[in-house]
UniProtKB/Swiss-Prot annotation:
SUPFAM superfamilies: Nucleic acid-binding proteins. This is Small ribosomal subunit protein uS12. GO terms for cellular component: small ribosomal subunit. It comes from Methanospirillum hungatei JF-1 (strain ATCC 27890 / DSM 864 / NBRC 100397 / JF-1). It comes from the Archaea. It holds the Pfam family Ribosom_S12_S23. The keyword Glycosyltransferase does not apply. The keyword rRNA-binding applies. GO terms for molecular function: rRNA binding; structural constituent of ribosome.
Length: 142
């Protein structure tokens, strides 16, 4: 690193070069976050339920978190989404259309004790899942 009176050009050039060794900068500058994001930068996405799955909670908790495997309509990618609420999984059937959004973990990752699940189900067949769980609305018959 230049230390002298006229070292500004070298300092500037070095800082521009060395910031590529910072993983956060490299991911942002390379647009890698958007490339790897199944929702492609969108806040929500729609998909078709492929199957219901039970995900075991991480230690020290002991539970089976009810999740669904969803294939996104926009790009065909498959993701896991958590069904929030007591008995919420009973309102979701295979081949239903669901709307998912990020679960809100740090850096866009999974949250709490549910490993590998980054998304949460908000709507089932265009009806809010929370409304179905508390009994305020009924799931439409097809």
């Amino acid at each position: 690193m230049g230390q002298g009176k006229f070292a500004a050009r070298k300092l500037k050039r070095d800082s521009a070069r060395f910031r590529w060794s910072d993983p956060h900068f490299a991911r942002t500058a390379g647009g890698l976050k958007l490339k790897s994001d199944p929702l492609e930068g969108a806040p929500q996405g729609r998909g078709i339920v492929l199957e219901k799955i039970g995900v075991e909670a991480k230690q020290p908790n002991s539970a089976i978190r009810k999740c669904v495997r969803v294939q996104l309509i926009k790009n065909g990618r498959q993701v896991s989404a958590f069904a929030v609420g007591d008995g919420a999984i009973n309102f979701i059937d295979e081949h239903d259309e669901v709307e998912i959004e990020g679960i809100g973990g740090r850096l866009g990752r999974s949250m709490g004790d549910i490993p590998g699940v980054r998304f949460v189900v908000t709507k089932v067949n265009n009806v809010c899942l929370h409304e179905l769980v508390i009994g305020r609305k009924e799931k439409p018959r097809r």
